[in-house]
Amino acid sequence: MNNRERFSSRLGFILISAGCAVGLGNVWRFPYITGQYGGAAFVLVYLIFLVLLGLPIMVMEFSVGRASQKSAARSFHVLEPAGTKWHLQGYACMAGNYLLMMFYTTVGGWMAAYIFKTLTGEFKGLDSDGVAAVFNDMLARPGYMTFWMVLVVLLSFFICSLGLQKGVERITKAMMSCLFLILLILCIRSVTLPGASEGLRFYLIPDFTRFTENGVGNTIFAAMGQAFFTLSLGIGAMAIFGSYIGKDHTLTGETINICLLDTLVAFLAGLIIFPSCFAFGVDPGQGPGLVFITLPNIFNQMVGGRIFGVLFFVFMTFAAQSTIIAVFENIISFSIDLFGTSRKKAVLINGIAIILLSLPCVFGFNIWSGFQPMGAGSTIQDLEDFIVSNNLLPLGSMVYLLFCTSRYGWGWKNFLAEADTGKGVKFPAWARVYVSYILPLIVLFIFIMGYYQKFK
C-alpha cells in the first residue's frame, strides 16, 4: 500500500489502541484477583509487572508496525534479514486474530442482548436463581445467540467499511469517551451506596495478610499473568496501529499512555463492583457469572437499578465492541496487505468468514455441548480461548522479543532507532540485557505455568 491510511490525530491512535487493550478481563477478572490477593498491595505488584512485561513488548509491536508500514501479515517480510523465516509469525498472528474473534463476538453479543433484557425489565422481580436461569436460557438458544453475534459482527464491519478515519477512528473515539463517562457515573453511584465503605476498604487498603495467605509465589504469578494478558500482545493486534501513525512521537511514551488508560478502566471497574457487592452482601466472584448473574441481581435490588443496569451493559458492550472493531481492522488489513483487495471487498469477505467461524462457539453451549474438548463441563469457547491465551499470545510475544533484540532478526539497533524516533520518553538502552535474555525467560515461565495450571 503506497498510500497507507493514517490516523487523523494522536488522540485517535491512543484511544483506539487502548480500546483494543481494554477488554472483558478488565471487568470480570482484574477486580476479583485484586480483592483475592490483597487489594492495593496486589495493584502495586501488578503495575510493576505491567512496566516490566507488558510495556516493552507493546513498544516492540508498535515499532515493527511503524517501521514496516504493514500489518502483521507482511511486517516481518519487510523487516527480516534475507533468507530467514521470521515471517512465519505473520501466519500465527492472523490465526490468533481470527481465533480471538471466533469467541469474542459471541460474548459481545451477550453484552448487547443484556442491554435489551435490562431495558425491557426482564429481570424485574427475579431472585438470584431467576437471574441465573435467564442467562442459562440464553445459552441454550442457538438462534437467539446467533442473532446477537451476527448483529455485533455486522455493526463492527460496517464501521470498518467506512474507513480508518471516518469509521474506525471516529466511532471508537466517541465510544471510548462514552465508556469513561459511563464508568464515572457508575462509580459515583456505587461508592455512595449504603454499606459501600466496606467494599472500598477491601479493594483499596493494602492487606498483606491476603497477599501472603494465598502464597507469595501465587500472588506474584497472578500479578504477572494479569499484566501480561490484559494487553493481548503477541498476535499483532497492536502492530497494525503502529503502521497507521507518523514518527512525531516516541513509541515508549505512547505505550505508557495506553497502559495507563487500560489500567484506569480496570481500576474503575473495581470501584463499581466491590462497593456494590458489599453493599448488598454478595460475593463478587469472577468471569461471566459476575457480569450476567451477580450484577443483574444487584441492579434488581438497587433504587434506579434498571437505569444503572442499562448503563453498565452499555459500558460492557463498548468495552467489547472497541476490541472487536480494533481486531476487525487488523483482519481487514491482512487481506489488503496480502492480496491488494479493496477495503470494501475485504470487509465483505471477512464479515462472512467471521460469522461462519463464530458459529461453533455459539453451538458449543447448546447443540454441540456434548463436545467437551478441555474436559468435563468445558466448551468450544474454552478450547478457542486456550489456543489464543495459553499459546499464541505468549509464544507470539516471545517471537516479537527475539525479533527485536537478536542480530538474526530485525535487531536491537533497528528496534531502538524506531522506538525512539520522535519526541517523548525514550526506550531505556540500558535495558538491552533484560529484554534480550531475562524477559523471554519470564514469558516462557508464564507459558509453562499456564499449561501447569490448566492441566494439573
Where in the sequence are the language-model features?
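Membrane-interface "cap" regions at the ends of multi-pass membrane proteins
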Residues: 1-28, 57-62, 66-91, 246-250, ...
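Transmembrane helix-boundary motif of multi-pass solute transporters/channels
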Residues: 11-49, 198, 236-242, 253-256, ...
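Loop-to-transmembrane helix boundary motifs in multi-pass membrane proteins
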Residues: 6, 12-14, 20, 142, ...
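Select transmembrane alpha-helical segments in multipass membrane proteins
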Residues: 6-17, 42-45, 84-98, 146-152, ...
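Inter-helical loop and helix-membrane interface segments of multi-pass membrane transporters/permeases
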Residues: 2-5, 33-37, 67-92, 105-165, ...
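C-terminal membrane-solvent junction of multi-pass transporters and transport-like membrane proteins
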Residues: 89, 94, 339-353, 385-443
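Helix-loop-helix connectors at the membrane interface of multi-pass transporters/channels
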Residues: 4, 108-140, 244-248, 253, ...
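Membrane-embedded translocation segments of transport machinery
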Residues: 2-3, 7, 169, 173-321, ...
